[in-house]
Amino acid sequence: LNISFSLIFWYNYSIKDLEVFMLDFSTMIYRIPALLFAITIHEYAHAQCADSMGDPTPRHMGRLTFNPMAHLDLMGAFLLVLVGFGWAKPVAINQNNFRNRKEGIIKDSLAGPAANLFACFLAAFMAALLNKFGMMGDGMYKFLLWMQLYNVWFAFFNLLPIPPLDGSKLVSEM
């Protein structure tokens, strides 16, 4: 398999396939699970990283979980599905608890976007594999396409150096 950045949007990709402005049930059945996964993996990665760097705050606040409800801001998720812009519930961290404050902030800021990029490439790999063996149905195609889109969008958007996004924390520690 040839895995490259172009694989992110694999065979016969077109904006029509994404049905970006379609808000009917047949579109939401693929978009909502992909969105919940992207939000959950992003925020869980922040929580896990902070915990591993010495900050128990996310664990104490119940954020060290794959349960999407712990990470979901209902209004932010609703707007993300509806208009393409929204937010999740940010993971609270106490930078003073990090064993190495600067390293902790940098690693924690990169954890969410890195998890999203990994999920994006995993979805692309799964799509290529399923397609190669002729096991790609229309539903799986749409779901994996939305998984890639939401995850790559979350990763790059969160790296913008605009407070309170992860990119602004990176810039402040450089």
Give the positions of each predicted feature.
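Hydrophobic transmembrane alpha-helices and their immediate loop junctions
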Residues: 2-174
